[in-house]
A protein has these predicted regions:
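Repeated scaffold domains used in trafficking and secretory/extracellular systems
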Residues: 65-76, 104-118, 147-161, 190-206, ...
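Short beta-strand elements that form the blades of beta-propeller/WD-repeat-like
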Residues: 72-85, 114-127, 132-133, 158-173, ...
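Aromatic (tryptophan-biased) beta-strands that constitute blades/sheets of beta-rich domains
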Residues: 7-14, 28-79, 87-88, 93-109, ...
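Structural recognition of the beta-propeller blade-terminating site
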Residues: 93, 134-136, 174-175, 228-234, ...
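Long, acidic/polar, low-complexity amphipathic helices and coiled-coil-like
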Residues: 91, 95-225
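Acidic, serine/threonine- and glycine-rich low-complexity intrinsically disordered segments
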Residues: 185-321
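Intrinsically disordered, low-complexity segments enriched in Gly and acidic/Ser/Thr residues
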Residues: 282, 290-294, 303-372
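Terminal targeting segments of Actinobacterial cell-envelope proteins
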Residues: 1-11, 19-23
Length: 404
């Protein structure tokens, strides 16, 4: 008969040591993990939906202000105004600015944007600004998340149903569930044969629609920029690509992608003379709008209702959102010069101007009324948006709420 195995004192000590090592290792992993640094405080109750303003206000006054250096324009989704500053993204009451929910990861934010019903915070890790977390804006509860290879700095934009994130060497387009639709540019390792593993070109400007992406690239040993049109394909890292030469448009020029529709892209080029060209999906220029002079370094674009508006630094060009057909230009008049792109309020185009807002017929561009508002001087574009009946302005790193 085999004698039962006896555990010695040494065995017990060894087993205890293993348990301690495993526990310490787990504790160290947790201590250095994003989970330990994440602080999520959902809303006490679901946030009610906003109701659109039905009339244009006759007066405006400041309601509240908040730091929001990580948004590039007012972010409104799920009944809240979303701000991002430092390491924290907040969902705020549009009327009062009070915090309804908060989310932070213990690291400086790369940027904040919105998509569908989510507020999206992007944080850095060892692979760049590619840690994205979606928060249901109406509840403050966590939704989808993703981790991606990215540049150390990225620019974020949204069309409402997708997000574009791009830096100097790489871009990605994400669906509302943060699943990647398109990736393009630098890879840190060869994943598939035929997919480049090194940066080919520097990405200088990009914009997207749910159906396509347009990006300008400065490529090695090339004096001119090129425009690249991307469409999602079966493999996200092998999109359909159409490259368009931009002769005479230097790699250090201020050329930029203004907006993208399903099959067209609006781009600004400075040569042979300043103009906005509309490029179709085959790469052909199908329309051009000449500008009286080049835009300033301070430009901005908004997509509101069925129009796209582009602020050039002293005027606002308005295009049809679907086909990017040029409609009209809002220029300085009566001592009032535009200081940012437009938004839409109660069916009227609302343009921030020197001492307030001017309203215009959205279809014809005919001037209507002026709403007085005193602002401190700003050296950036003033970018407006609506949150119900509250008018928001992104003024550099500050978000300002206005009402009657």
């Amino acid at each position: 008969m085999v004698k039962p195995e006896r555990r010695t004192k040494a065995d017990l000590i060894a087993a205890a040591a293993i348990v301690v090592v495993v526990a310490v290792g787990a504790a160290l992993i947790w201590w250095n993990s994003d989970a330990r640094a994440t602080v999520s405080r959902p809303a006490d109750r679901p946030v009610p939906a906003l109701h659109a303003a039905k009339t244009v206000p006759t007066t405006l006054r400041e309601l509240w202000t908040a730091a929001s250096g990580k948004t590039t324009q007012p972010a409104v989704v799920g009944g809240v105004v979303v701000t991002g500053d430092g390491d924290e993204m907040l969902g705020r009451d549009p009327a009062t600015g009070s915090t309804l929910w908060s989310y932070s990861r213990g690291r400086e934010l790369c940027g904040v944007t919105t998509v569908y019903q989510f507020a999206v915070a992007v944080y850095p890790d060892g692979r760049g600004c590619g840690q994205a977390s979606a928060i249901d804006a109406s509840t403050g509860r966590r939704g989808p998340a993703r981790s991606s290879l990215a540049d150390a700095e990225v620019k974020l934009s949204t069309d409402g149903t997708t997000i574009l994130s791009y830096g100097d060497s790489r871009l990605e387009q994400w669906r509302s569930d943060l699943v990647r639709m398109i990736s393009y540019g630098y890879l840190d390792a060869v994943v598939k044969p035929g997919v480049p593993a090194s940066p080919l070109c520097r990405l200088t400007s990009a914009a997207a629609s749910p159906a396509s992406v347009a990006v300008m690239e400065a490529c090695p040993k090339q004096n001119d920029l090129r425009l690249t049109l991307l469409k999602a394909a079966k493999e996200e890292d092998q999109p359909d690509v159409k490259r368009v030469a931009l002769p005479g448009v230097g790699v250090d020029s201020d050329a930029q992608v203004i907006a993208v529709s399903e099959t067209k892209a609006a781009i600004y080029v400075p040569t042979p003379q300043p103009c906005v060209n509309i490029i179709d999906e085959t790469g052909n220029t199908i329309a051009s709008t000449l500008l009286p002079h080049p835009p300033t370094p301070v430009t901005a674009t908004t997509r509101v209702g069925d129009v796209v508006t582009w602020y050039t630094g002293d005027s606002v060009l308005v295009f049809d959102a679907n086909g990017l057909r040029y409609k009209y230009t809002v220029s300085a008049q009566g001592g009032q010069a535009p200081i940012g792109p437009a938004t839409m309020l109660a069916g009227h185009l609302l343009v921030p101007v020197t001492s307030g807002y001017d309203t215009f017929d959205a279809q014809s561009g005919a001037g209507q009324t002026h709403i007085a508002l005193a602002r401190p001087p700003v050296n950036t574009a003033v970018i407006p948006a609506l949150a119900g009946s509250v008018l928001l302005e992104q003024r550099g790193s500050q978000l300002v709420a206005l009402g009657q």
